[in-house]
Amino acid sequence: MHINYVISLTSAYQRREHIQKEFSQQNIPFEFFDALKPSKELTSLIEKFIPNLLHAKLTEGEKACFMSHYMLWQKCFSEDLPYIYIFEDDVLLGENADKFLAEDEWLEEAFKQTDKFILRFETFLNFSKCKDKKIKPYSGRKILKLVSENCGAAGYVISREAVKQLSAHICSLTSNHLLAIDLLMFNIFNQSTYQVSPGVCVQEGQLYPKDIKLHSQLETERQKYLSVKKKRTLKTVLISLAGKPKKILRKIYRKLFISKHIVPFR
């Protein structure tokens, strides 16, 4: 029987209470994994495992998030686990989530122990082009091959073989190529990624963007980082206006095409 690890800061009392309620409602066992935060400990771990991450163009919070996931991967590798289930502490669980998170037989039927895979339980409610690889559906959900890039690392299971290869790839990257952990997993490494559809979990902020109760310090930090912009000039204003027709066309395209490739949450 596997353990569902939920990455959470020890000080995130509201989020931990949320997870206790969310998982206990379906009798899903889990353990909190104390999330790393900007500190001497974080710096020490980065220096030991991924030195180039120190100079990556990420916020300190993003580096802490990166290493929290990475250290769980190392736990999978060091304890010789066939796979490890990892979640973040703002997830909402769908119906019958216990069938996927409290049982192992379905996963062992879908994949071999020697397979290299990352299986997303999460839907980010964005464009997610998938292919049917003829894996047997389970409990009303399909297991599809994810063929498009994606983002979000709030709910997934990763195999030991994938941990081994992805860790080696990450350690080979220069600081300029080290991105947020989810982008490396589902953009750069997407040849080994799969998607449960409909999604088993979703981040609160993706499902209820206008009614977020579980506020994120990481997201606040990221938005501050992104909001540092140069003063707009007449040239940039004119360029922006010239691009408006393209934006309108993109909206139409999203409605007609992209909406057909969104993994639903149920």
From Swiss-Prot:
Enzyme class: transferase
Source organism, top-level taxon: Bacteria
Keywords: Glycosyltransferase, Transferase, Virulence
InterPro entries: Glyco_trans_25
Keyword Transcription regulation set for record: no
Protein EC: 2.-.-.-
Gene Ontology MF, one: glycosyltransferase activity
Function: Involved in extracellular lipooligosaccharide (LOS) biosynthesis and virulence expression. Involved in the synthesis of the oligosaccharide moiety of the LOS molecule by adding GalNAc.
Entry's family note: Belongs to the glycosyltransferase 25 family.
Name of protein: Lipooligosaccharide biosynthesis protein lic2B
